[in-house]
A protein has these predicted regions:
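Substrate-recognition element of Asp-dependent hydrolases with the DxDx(T/V) motif
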Residues: 85-115, 130
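Short, flexible loop segments at the rims of nucleotide/cofactor-binding pockets, characterized by
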Residues: 75-80, 104-106, 129-132, 170
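Short, surface-exposed alpha-helical segments at coil->helix boundaries
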Residues: 15-20, 47, 108-112, 137, ...
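Conserved Rossmann-like nucleotide-cofactor binding loop
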Residues: 10, 17, 107, 158, ...
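N-terminal helical cap/lid subdomain that shapes the substrate entry/recognition surface
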Residues: 2-87
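Asp-based, Mg2+/Mn2+-dependent phosphohydrolase catalytic module
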Residues: 1, 112-201
Length: 201
């Protein structure tokens, strides 16, 4: 059995990283951490937030700076593993499952830096990074033979749709970047509060 895990929001808690960078780039922002994430978890993007709350009609300079800074070590060091994930990955490996990391990160160095930092580097059979150039499906298809017994686990609608396109089971977790109500619209095979609640059969 193959299990494909998304990284940000699914295995690691990146909420603080995104919020702190937003506050840095928009210093006039008085949005609290919870206010910012209430918006984001309801699928309200930065372009809409900038226009509605700050009167910024051209979001391109913001987006450019965001992409430049979001994967720097300064901000990556704000990330932390979701509770119990290390033990969970050990549990899955002991079941002789094939685990893959599939992420939309731009830069491999930040991914490997965090995997080494968290002690996860040897848990995965392969680490697939789209570099914001390819879809997750594009990376998985030519490299790994999948079947209907396999899973993809993520916290976004895109992850669920990837599973459907690959004809594998899609598992959503609701403690990441989208709310349970938003995730339900994509009709995953199951939704869990956190990744460690998922136990593949």
């Amino acid at each position: 059995m193959n299990i494909f895990f998304d990284f940000d929001g699914t295995l690691i808690d990146s909420h603080r990283r995104l919020y702190e960078l937003f506050q840095f780039l928009i210093p006039e922002s008085t949005l609290s951490f919870n206010e910012y994430w209430d918006l984001k978890r309801n699928q309200i993007d930065h372009k809409t937030i900038l226009k509605k709350y700050f009167g910024i009609n051209n979001s391109q300079p913001f987006e450019k700076e965001w992409m430049k800074k979001i994967e720097t070590k300064k901000y990556l060091d704000l990330d932390k593993p979701h509770e119990g994930v290390t033990e969970y990955l050990i549990y899955l490996k002991n079941k002789n499952l094939s685990l893959y990391l599939i992420t939309d990160r731009q830069l491999p160095r930040g991914v490997y830096y965090q995997l080494k930092k968290f002690g996860w580097i040897n848990f995965f059979d392969a680490i697939l990074i789209t570099a914001q150039k390819y879809s997750k499906e594009d990376l998985i298809k030519p490299l790994i033979s999948t079947n209907k017994a396999d899973y993809i686990v993520g916290d976004t609608g895109k992850d669920i749709l990837t599973g459907k396109n690959l004809k594998i089971k899609s598992i959503a977790v609701s403690n990441g970047f989208l709310s349970k109500e938003i995730l339900e619209k994509y009709r995953p095979d199951a939704i869990y509060n956190k990744v460690t609640d998922f136990h593949p059969e």
